[in-house]
A protein has these predicted regions:
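Conserved nucleotide-sugar donor-binding catalytic segment
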Residues: 2, 6-94
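C-terminal subregions of glycosyltransferases and related glycan-biosynthesis enzymes
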Residues: 59-62, 66, 71-169
Length: 169
């Protein structure tokens, strides 16, 4: 998985199990730019796999839990360009309902531990969602829809999540 320095380690790290890999990758496992797969592994994926509407790449990625070796490459190679006034869909729902539902399913199947799932959700709650709010309401560089945000948090996050997200901005 390629993270372009977003994790801050600026190195490559290998993992011998999916749980440790996901724990260290955290919510970046949702990033479509980072996912890559060998064609031979892609061809083994069940053709009837139901792809998540917002995270089809993550649906594919999570099928690779049985692999023997995983790699996170956090070396910086590219300058990421900010797209002004980026938006158009409900990114808040994507990270309060859709992506957490994939993690929940992965946990229920035993591919990641409850500790791993909670770690990833905590990262979203104190890092990712506050940055979305900051970009939308404070510096106004993104225009993502946030309809249902406060209510959607109640499904996969603790009862205090809304307030923690707000104070983390």
């Amino acid at each position: 998985f390629y993270t372009n320095g977003l994790l801050g380690s600026r190195k490559s790290q290998t993992y011998s199990n999916f749980n440790d890999f996901m724990y260290n990758l955290s919510y970046w496992s949702s990033w479509s730019n980072g996912f890559n797969i060998w064609k031979s592994e892609f061809d083994k994926i069940d053709k009837n796999l139901k792809l998540n509407k917002l995270f089809p790449h993550t649906s594919l990625f999570l099928t690779q839990h049985q692999a023997k070796l995983f790699c996170i490459n956090d070396n910086l190679l590219f300058d990421v360009q900010r797209i002004p006034k980026r938006g158009g869909h409900n990114k808040f729902e994507a990270f309060t309902i859709e992506y957490p539902s994939l993690l929940d399913e992965c946990c229920k199947k035993g591919h990641i531990s409850t500790k791993c799932k909670k770690h990833i959700l905590f990262g979203i709650m104190v890092q990712f969602l506050p940055s979305l709010l900051f970009n939308k309401y404070i510096i106004r560089i993104e225009t993502f829809d946030d309809t249902g945000f406060r209510n959607n948090l109640k499904k996969y996050y603790p009862s205090y999540a809304y307030w923690l997200v707000l104070i983390s901005v």
